[in-house]
Swiss-Prot record:
Protein name: Glycerol kinase
Record entry for activity regulation: Activated by phosphorylation and inhibited by fructose 1,6-bisphosphate (FBP).
InterPro entries: ATPase_NBD, Carb_kinase_FGGY, Carb_kinase_FGGY_CS, FGGY_C, FGGY_N, Glycerol_kin
Gene: glpK
Binding residues for glycerol: R82, E83, Y135, D245, Q246
Family label: Belongs to the FGGY kinase family.
Species assigned in the record: Clostridium beijerinckii (strain ATCC 51743 / NCIMB 8052) (Clostridium acetobutylicum)
Amino acid sequence: MKKYILALDQGTTSSRAIIFDKEQNILGVSQKEFTQIYPNQGWVEHNPLEIWASQYGVLQEVIAKTNITQEEVAAIGITNQRETTIVWDKNTGEPVYNAIVWQCRRTAGIIEELKLDKEFSEYVKENTGLLLDAYFSATKIKWILDNVEGARERAEKGELLFGTVDTWLVWKLTNGKVHVTDYTNASRTMLYNIKELRWDERILEKLNIPKSMLPEVKNSSEVYGYTNLGGTGGVRVPIAGMAGDQQCALFGQTCFEEGSVKNTYGTGCFLLMNTGEKMIHSKNGLVSTIAVGIDGKVQYALEGSVFVGGAVIQWIRDELKLVTDAADTEYFAQKVEDNGGVYVVPAFTGLGAPYWDMYARGAIFGLTRGANRNHIIRAALESIAYQSKDLIDAMQEDAGCKLTRLKVDGGASRNNLLMQFQADITGAEVVRPIITETTALGAAYLAGLAVGFWKSKEEIAEKWAVSQSYSPNLAEEKKEKLYKGWKKAVKRAEGWEEE
């Protein structure tokens, strides 16, 4: 009897495995952290074999822990850190280099060179939906081919394969039989034409990347292959769903309709809006990406990210030592009625969308003699909501629609003061679901739909339940005054590092 879906959630700092039942209850979770490698300033790597070992380890652990049998697992769904790049030998399975992680800035020089070709920059934006940036996979592959001895020659002979983390996991789970990715992960490589749904020859040629390295692009929900979960029974379990982490969170939040939006409050914030079958080109520095691909049809999304979201709370705790526990920020922030005119702009590494200012730096503005610890803590929390509002306003303008409801998840979404302020400052209802494991849940949904475990998106949406909702409760005049203060503070922080 098929009773469960196993979701593999391969993140930037840890690998997790979660078991869901048909009612979307979580039966068990296993998690294992793995090594972050920093060979040079601004470089970030992972060992691909350690990614695999940690992911396979938690898969076996969660099955043992929950005492379920392989026969009871209907399917496996995969969600993953996006853009991270792995190149390996297709005969031996040995990686030729460490995985180059999405955060890694080593290819910034290659990007600057490419940007000199204005026509090419425009072509990339128009056809991949992305801005030329070291964040995406394309220049990471080029770097490996150019810098690892013999790599280019081997790639041209068809001996090397490229994959994002989803591709690597499926390849390992199927013992090297299956080399695939899904539409969402392909859309983050900067090599995939999201209008025509194909690898883009012009970009491949410009970067000198052999097409033979690339995986086949499949739906986000279909059976890609089978794996044996390591028992003696030899039961073959289908691997049936796959999408990048932010797209999975959008799907896990049941944002199936055009115009629906979710915000994940993690270290940074990731805001995605489903734009349906329309690919919208942002005029506000957002990227266009594929939200999901099912039955050969894709839905698109607009995506914006805040570099420093929950990380501002860590800064308050670890560097300023204003609290000993991140959860205490709510308690102290509530001790004051408002921010007392204080604004924190956490531009520690510059500002992302819609500003895109790499030279902005963090600052605290509006201090008076009466400003105290609580005002600074409150202003830090509010900065997360202001930055999210900046993105929401940009999205509304690009999509030509008004947001009435924002679905939220991620660690900082548990902070009630922050969520209430988010509702107040955006004028939209903010909704937190009962299951906040939305990324893994999205992967489970995709896999479950492919094998008939759940019959339809409608069945899934019916089971999606609200834990708490926050309605806007701030006078328009007060809202405008607060936001105007934020805009003024950002203006002062911009361009700080420039000579």
